[in-house]
Amino acid sequence: MSFRDLRNFTEMMRALGYPRLISMENFRSPNFPLVAEILIWLVKRYEPQMEIPSDVDTESDRVFFIKAVAQFMATKAHVKLNLKRLYQADGYAVKEMLKITSILYNAMKTKENAGGDQNNDENSKFKFDLGSKIADLKLARQLGSEITAKGAALFDLLGQEEDLRESRTAAIARPLEITETERAMRAAVKDVTESIQMTKDLLNNVSSDEASLEAKIEKKKQDLERNQKRLQTLQSVRPAFMDEYEKIEEDLEKQYQTYVEKYRNLSFLEQQLDDYHRVEQERFEEAEMAMKMRQNKLKEEEKRLMRSGVARDEDSDVDIPEDEGSDSDIDDGQQARPHHPRHTQISGRGGARFIGSMRGGDSEETEDSEIDVDDDDEDDDEDGEEDEEENEDLDEDNDSLEGSSGKPGRTNQSLHPQILEESDNDF
């Protein structure tokens, strides 16, 4: 494609009156929709009544469109187009479309030049209109194609004249026989008579068929009217069983209402039962969980008490050897200082006698309380009561000792601090 061809094409299309502005950049790349639009417009310029499919969405539609345009131009304008270049829709397609536009543009220029030579004023008043001459151009193209076809047929027939001349001459020179001619004429007349009789029979059959069809139609109409009247009668008359039917229908409706109500109640009760089971299950699970928690708590408390009991046993085991050791020391030192064992009688000035011991670790109540604590660690209240009893006994012993300390003489006063000192060490 050259720049000159593209420029000439755009100028010719503008001169022919193409409504769209064509740029030189439109054909740098394939643009099939624009090429299809231009080809349709050019075909309409040749023949406005020509119908060409404008669907070019698919590949097959485009091929069919290009073939239709090329065939039209070949038969009407005697212009041979390259289908491959038209399908490319680029600069090479412009060369093919330039063939069509050149014919139209030259015809327009020739008409303008002829009109300008005759009368420039008339040309200025009446503009050249190619559209008004399209019908004449169409008729001329059609006549030209018919003349060409008939001329070709005539040429073929004239070519067969040499072969048919001898047969025609022999047929003309042969004398006609009356018998054969009469026989042929009678055969022809007989054939014509048979065909006429057959046609009459067909006409008679048609008339009879028409009469039978009319009779059938009339019969059907009568049946239809009779059935309509019967239908109206049946609709107007109330059946004898209608009362019973209505009564049964009412009973059935009541039964259905009762069924629906009972079904709803049953559904509601089932739902309530399910809710109750669910609540009971939740309560059971909560109770089981609480029981497990209490069991775990009791186990932990038991473990804690066992640990505390073991600790107290260890403490008591540690304290007992110390007491034994202290007792042994006291036994060893009995010769050095006097010692008053349990239940000893201390004489005073007034002759009062006190029975008891100042050693808290040697009391029976203290031993019993220690045994109770070691054996039953779970009962904290009992331990507290025993501790209170121990404290009360110790207080009573101390009070009794204090009462006796004021009455005895110096000898007793000298011994009393030793006993208190030993008891303090024992505690």
Swiss-Prot record:
Basic and acidic residues biased stretches: 300-313
Localisation: Nucleus; Cell projection, Cilium
Coiled-coil stretches: 202-307
Pfam families in alphabetical order: Cluap1
Any Gene Ontology CC annotation: nucleus
Record bears the keyword Nucleus: yes
Main location: nucleus
Disruption phenotype: Mutant animals develop ventrally curved bodies visible at the end of 1 dpf, followed by bilateral kidney cysts in the glomerular-tubular region detectable at 2 dpf. Cilia in the anterior pronephric ducts are already visibly defective at 1 dpf and by 5 dpf, cilia are completely absent from these ducts. On the other hand, cilia from the posterior pronephric ducts remain unaffected. Cilia biogenesis is also defective in the retina, with the outer segments of photoreceptor cells having modified cilia. No visible cilia in the lateral line organ. Pericardial edema is also observed at 5 dpf.
Compositionally biased region (Acidic residues): 314-332, 363-400
InterPro entries the record matches: Clusterin-associated_protein-1 (IPR019366)
Keyword Hydrolase applies: no
Keywords associated with the record: Cell projection, Cilium, Cilium biogenesis/degradation, Coiled coil, Nucleus
Annotated stretches, region: Disordered: 300-427
One of the GO biological process terms: kidney development
Described function: Required for cilia biogenesis and maintenance in the kidney, the lateral line organ and eye. Appears to function within the multiple intraflagellar transport complex B (IFT-B).
Family: Belongs to the CLUAP1 family.
Protein name from the UniProt record: Clusterin-associated protein 1 homolog
Organism of origin: Danio rerio
Gene: cluap1
